[in-house]
């Protein structure tokens, strides 16, 4: 099981969704969670360092989740960070685009705590966390 001190960054322009994800993470024992409202805000926080996992929405103003993902993967300092996309984009082409851009996992909204836990555990297992 992953380190409970792992620092998460939850990126979503909808504050209620950020709060839902934060609360689900808390239920799973992860209390070290920060929030960002779009990709630009997220990058500013990520460049300060210290994060171990990103959970990001797709559709956001300024910089969407896919652009954020591509930017993270192109930056050698952040490229290994796991990124879980949590989005209403359920179309096959969106899921393929996220996978090709390097998403560690993909969850379609709405989702349950069990679904989030299952995806996180798969990513932790794959990365040996």
Curated annotation (Swiss-Prot):
Q: Which residues in this protein are found as N6-acetyllysine?
A: 92, 109
Q: Which cofactor does it need?
A: Mg(2+)
List cystine links: none
Q: What would changing residue 57 to N do, according to UniProt?
A: Abolishes function and phosphorylation
Q: Encoded by which gene?
A: cheY
Where is Mg(2+) annotated to bind? 12-13, 57, 59
Which chain regions cross the lipid bilayer? none
UniProt main location, coarse: cytoplasm
Point out residues bearing the modification 4-aspartylphosphate: 57
Entry GO MF terms: metal ion binding
Localization terms from the record: Cytoplasm
CDD domains in the record, alphabetically? REC_CheY_CheY3
Q: Which domain of life is it from?
A: Bacteria
On assembly, the entry states: Interacts (phosphorylated CheY) with CheZ (via C-terminus).
Entry keywords, A to Z: Acetylation, Chemotaxis, Cytoplasm, Flagellar rotation, Magnesium, Metal-binding, Phosphoprotein, Two-component regulatory system
Q: How is the cofactor bound?
A: Binds 1 Mg(2+) ion per subunit.
Q: What protein name does the entry list?
A: Chemotaxis protein CheY
InterPro entries noted in UniProt? CheY-like_superfamily (IPR011006), Sig_transdc_resp-reg_receiver (IPR001789), ST_Response_Regulator (IPR052048)
Q: What does this protein do?
A: Involved in the transmission of sensory signals from the chemoreceptors to the flagellar motors. In its active (phosphorylated or acetylated) form, CheY exhibits enhanced binding to a switch component, FliM, at the flagellar motor which induces a change from counterclockwise to clockwise flagellar rotation. Shows autophosphatase activity which is enhanced by CheZ.
Which GO terms of type biological process are on file? archaeal or bacterial-type flagellum-dependent cell motility; chemotaxis; phosphorelay signal transduction system
Task: Give the Response regulatory domain ranges.
Answer: 7-124
Q: Which GO terms describe its cellular component?
A: cytoplasm
Per the UniProt record, the source organism is Salmonella typhimurium (strain LT2 / SGSC1412 / ATCC 700720)
For this chain, the Swiss-Prot or TrEMBL PTM comment says:
Phosphorylated by CheA or acetylated by acetyl-CoA synthetase, depending on which acetate metabolism pathway is available. Dephosphorylated (inactivated) by CheZ.
């Amino acid at each position: 099981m992953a380190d409970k001190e792992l620092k998460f960054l939850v990126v979503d322009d909808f504050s209620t969704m950020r709060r839902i994800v934060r609360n689900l993470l808390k239920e799973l024992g992860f209390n070290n969670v920060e929030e960002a409202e779009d990709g630009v805000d997220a990058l500013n926080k990520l460049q300060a360092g210290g994060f171990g996992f990103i959970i990001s929405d797709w559709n956001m103003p300024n910089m969407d989740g896919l652009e954020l993902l591509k930017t993270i993967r192109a930056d050698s300092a952040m490229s290994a960070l796991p990124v879980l996309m949590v989005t209403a984009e359920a179309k096959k082409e969106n899921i393929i685009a996220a996978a090709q851009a390097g998403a560690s996992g993909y969850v379609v909204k709405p989702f349950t705590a069990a679904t989030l836990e299952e995806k996180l555990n798969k990513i932790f297992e794959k990365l040996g966390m």
